[in-house]
Amino acid sequence: YNSDITRTYALSKLDSEVEKLWHAEKQAQQAAFDRAAIGTSCEDVDKAARDVLISHGLGPDYDLPGLPHRTGHGIGLDIHEGPYLVKGDKTPLAAGMCFSNEPMICSYGEFGVRLEDHIYMTAEGAAWFTEPAHSVDDPFGVTV
């Protein structure tokens, strides 16, 4: 089985606007997780993430700066497989499904922010395979 994770983090002090966008990305990822429930459509999970980004003045839809692609994809035998957490995918979430949860923010030529983790569906709802980023300067929660 295949998977991957992505972390955007800073080695030094960030511009305050970029740091705000990092937090918007984290909120969008959490919104997608919170919306993932048995029977919810894949596109509704995508919409939850996009709604957060819209509330931060990004997008809408696939407009930039904002989220230019899907919120997530199935994971398993292939690193990217269906179903997809994207507008138009009406597949209902079911126990046993596994997904990436990776909304990202892009402003071409300027910056990008992505936090990618994996979730799986249980009979009770979504659960994390990977632990979401802790902070912009300590992505794995291991400050030394």
Report the location of each language-model feature.
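Active-site neighborhoods and metal-handling regions in enzymes and metal-associated proteins
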Residues: 1-144
